[in-house]
Design a protein with these regions (language model features):
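Active-site mouth loops of central-metabolism enzymes
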Residues: 57-69, 120-129, 256-260
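Conserved, mostly hydrophobic/aromatic
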Residues: 41, 53, 87, 102, ...
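N-terminal binding-site loop/beta-alpha segment at the start of enzyme catalytic domains
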Residues: 1-114, 171, 177
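Glycine/proline-rich, positively charged
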Residues: 123-241, 248-255, 261-262, 276
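Conserved beta-strand positions
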Residues: 53, 89, 118, 149-152, ...
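Structured C-terminal cap/extension of enzyme domains
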Residues: 223-427
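Structural motif corresponding to the early beta-alpha repeats
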Residues: 93, 108-132, 153
């Protein structure tokens, strides 16, 4: 996506306009003391927590890709006590470690006390035989005999065509008939036109899409949400903070929100925006520390939808924020590994932070600390990352621009005169 088109999307005045009620709203049930609010699944007695625990960004051990089990276990305990008993993992998450973690840490709880969601990695499937092998592997890793919610993972036009060719839906429906899947849906990264085709193809139990107040028009999330709502398909939301971006707004936007609600986090505004949509069943959050979890529990306990005045406040904050954002990366890391080792999401995070804070010194120091093979200049424009990017970012073009900016800043002595707070340095 070109930056011009990106900013044009942000400028759309309807970005925060309330969506029409195209179908019956999910019924919210009163929260018990210390627990998050819940919503009913369609017209059944099944209730699910409005907050779901995403397992793509679990805490890691220092200087290691390994999951910090001690910290994660403590967070799971806290979540379960607060009624946050929906856990979302996937075959690829955290280098394949996420499903193992789910099995290792959740198996101590009674199986009927929590909901477990995982996904068939359509991109990894080559033949129909792979379906059985991968599904059984997932059950083993998660130490379970069934998944409460299961998805075709990250569908787009090509993934959907492949799924039809290999009979993925039919295979998973057999697993559902065997009791190994309770609810079958899909997660999605493409245009509303493709979503219309997929949503119309089968009687899906739910769908997982990217929704947040930044992408409501930018990523055409509103159109996607309305398609699913018209078809009475409950929505599970991913990327409500857009990869953490909406939790770290620039000072101007943050000030607007804090003036309106002192003591409330930027993240709480983003979660309330998503939770205010009537057909949203669960909002996922990839929490990496106890502070994130505690703040989210506070937001979703006795949940209240945004008022018209609060929507106007959020609109004003978005207007202030849009001036500083450079690259619409959510840090999903689907672009990795880069064949030549470029640290794509890390570079984008550095650059966006610099644009938001104006601290060129922090950017040049952190970018310059990367190995040369990890910098944008090492990109060979093979295009592998572009095909994998759910945001459709022209990654080679952005890397080239960022590397040019870095070299230009490095030549300027002013870049090194800025104060560099420790928290803005990237390790």
């Amino acid at each position: 996506m070109k930056r011009r088109d990106f900013l044009k999307g942000l400028l759309t005045a309807a970005a925060l306009a309330p969506v029409s009620k195209l179908a019956a709203a999910a019924v919210q049930t009163p929260a018990s003391a210390g627990k998050v609010s819940r919503r009913k699944y369609r017209s059944t007695d099944l209730t699910l927590p409005m907050l779901g625990f995403g397992m793509m960004r679990l805490p890691r051990k220092k200087n290691s890709p390994e999951i910090d089990y001690e910290k994660t276990a403590a967070m799971f305990d806290r979540a379960m006590k607060a009624g946050v008993n929906y856990f979302d993992t996937a075959y690829f998450y955290l280098g394949g470690r996420s499903e193992n973690c789910a099995g290792d840490l959740l198996s101590k709880y009674p199986r009927d006390s929590y909901f477990l969601a995982s996904k068939m990695p359509v991109g990894r499937v080559k033949t129909a035989a792979d379906l059985e092998r991968i599904f059984n592997e997932q059950l083993t890793k998660c130490k379970t005999t069934y998944f409460d919610f299961y998805m075709l993972h990250a569908l787009n036009a090509s993934g959907w065509a492949k799924s039809k060719r290999l009979g993925v839906y039919e295979f998973l429906m057999k697993k559902k008939a065997e009791g190994k899947i309770r609810k079958l849906g899909f997660s999605f990264h493409d245009t509303p036109e493709v979503l219309e085709e997929i949503a119309s193809a089968h009687p899906w139990d739910f769908a997982q899409i990217q929704v947040n107040y930044l992408d409501w028009t930018l990523y055409r999330s509103r159109e996607q949400y309305e398609i699913l709502t018209r078809k009475n398909i409950p929505v599970i939301v991913m990327e409500p903070l857009r990869g953490g971006i909406l939790a770290k707004l620039n000072p101007a936007a943050t000030q607007i929100l804090s003036n309106a609600a002192p003591g409330k986090s930027n993240a709480s505004w983003a979660f309330r925006y998503v939770g205010s949509l009537p057909n949203v069943l669960i909002t996922l959050s990839g929490m990496t520390c106890m502070e994130h979890l505690d703040d989210n529990i506070k937001t979703f306990s006795n949940f209240t939808v945004l008022s018209p005045a609060e929507r106007k406040t959020l609109d004003a904050a978005l207007t202030a924020y849009r001036k500083g954002l450079a690259v619409p990366c959510t840090d999903c890391r689907y672009c990795l590994p880069c064949p030549v080792g470029v640290e794509i999401p890390r570079i984008f995070a550095m650059y966006n932070q610099m644009k938001l804070t104006g601290n060129r010194g922090a950017f040049t120091r952190s970018y310059g600390a990367l190995d040369e093979d990890a910098q944008g200049s090492a990109c060979v424009a093979c295009g592998k990352c572009v095909k994998a990017c759910p945001q459709k970012i022209n990654i080679p073009e952005q890397l080239k621009r960022i590397d040019m900016d870095f070299k230009r800043m490095k030549r300027s002595k002013k870049a090194f005169n800025a104060a560099i707070p420790d928290e803005e340095l990237y390790s």
